[in-house]
A protein has these predicted regions:
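Positively charged, low-complexity intrinsically disordered leader regions
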Residues: 1-28
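Short beta-strand segments enriched in small/hydrophobic residues
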Residues: 31-41
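Glycine-rich phosphate/diphosphate-binding loop of Rossmann-like nucleotide-binding domains
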Residues: 41-51, 134-225, 229, 234, ...
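Short beta-strand elements in bilobed, periplasmic/extracellular small-molecule ligand-binding domains
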Residues: 56-70, 185-188
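Short, well-structured alpha-helical segments in soluble
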Residues: 76-87
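Short glycine-rich anion-binding loops that position phosphate/pyrophosphate groups of nucleotides
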Residues: 90, 95-100, 210-213, 231-234, ...
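Anion-binding alpha/beta catalytic cores of soluble intermediary-metabolism enzymes, centered on
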Residues: 92-156
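Rossmann-fold NAD(P)-binding glycine/threonine-rich loop
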Residues: 104-125, 230-282
Length: 283
């Protein structure tokens, strides 16, 4: 068994987006648009935003990037988010933001049908209730796409999944999404006892703890699907995930996502998919 070809999955997703774009009558409709609001000067955010803009432009989605000063006041940030929401089909607040701002309030100002990140309380509730209009956070959707691709049948009934992450970006929405598709999901976190007992028995293991090469062969067994959402740097400054891929593959026959070139590239592709979903909700 080997590393999962996430580039092939990404291309399938982007081709679907292209197909949806071709259905639009541009004589009467504008092209789908995405607004990205960045607050402050976070280096990682610059890279992520650049990748999103590049991908969107390559497939025909219009992007407006709004850069705000890191010392902006809460009320002014709220005003800008409300104003920008009116002018676009989809809008996102690039995280993280400066600590003096109330992230929850800012995110929940975004209308549900334009919440391309799927992070508003309303969207999260709709996802839990399996509402067809729910917008799924892009990383969680990317993980779901990988599982579907690897299972081939697309049927998650009876599949045991352990997710080691309980964030709103990955763990919580992924638990809801997979449960809605009849998988059996165990959500683990930093307070979980005997983590190895959960990971070893599962068909699928999803990690997202932000610890370089934390998971070695102790946590896995043969014939598992391992999806690594971690993005870290090892002691040599090299990009790596949460899983020690080489060590695990020496011990067990597993399928595992690479880092880099794994879940990260699918997150951007799935964001484009969500832009189309937002557009369709409004047209």
């Amino acid at each position: 068994m080997a590393k999962i070809d996430c580039k092939a999955i990404r291309e399938e997703i982007l081709q679907h987006v292209r197909d949806e774009l071709e259905k639009i009558d541009y004589e009467t409709e504008l092209a789908p648009s995405l607004a990205i609001i960045t607050i402050g000067d976070d280096d990682a955010s610059k890279v992520y935003v650049r990748n999103k803009i590049k991908t969107a432009n390559s497939i025909g989605i219009e992007v407006k990037h709004v850069q705000l000063d890191g010392d902006i006041e809460q009320k002014e940030a709220e005003k800008i988010i409300i104003e920008e929401s009116i002018e676009t089909d989809a809008i996102m607040l690039q995280l993280p933001i400066p600590k003096h701002l109330d992230e929850k309030i800012l995110i929940n100002l975004i209308p549900q049908c334009k919440d391309v990140d799927g992070l508003t309380d309303l969207n999260m509730g709709m996802l839990v209730n399996n509402h067809p209009y729910a917008i799924v956070p892009a990383t969680a959707m990317g993980v779901y796409k990988i599982i579907n691709y690897m299972l081939e049948t697309g049927d998650l009934t009876g599949v045991d999944v352990t997710v080691v992450n309980r964030s709103q970006l990955i763990g919580k929405p992924l638990q809801a999404l997979l449960t809605n598709h009849n998988a059996t999901v165990t959500l683990c976190h930093s307070k979980t006892d005997n983590l190895q007992n959960h990971t070893c028995r599962s068909h699928v293991v999803v990690t997202g703890i932000g610890q370089p090469k934390y998971f070695d062969s102790y946590y896995f067994s043969d014939y598992q699907l391992i999806i690594d959402c971690g993005m870290n740097r090892d002691e040599n400054g090299k990009l790596c995930g949460d899983v020690d891929v080489d060590e695990v593959q020496q011990e067990f026959k597993v399928h595992v996502t690479p880092t880099p070139g794994g879940t990260g590239i699918l997150t951007t592709a799935c964001l484009m998919l969500s832009v189309i979903h937002c557009y369709n909700l409004q047209h």
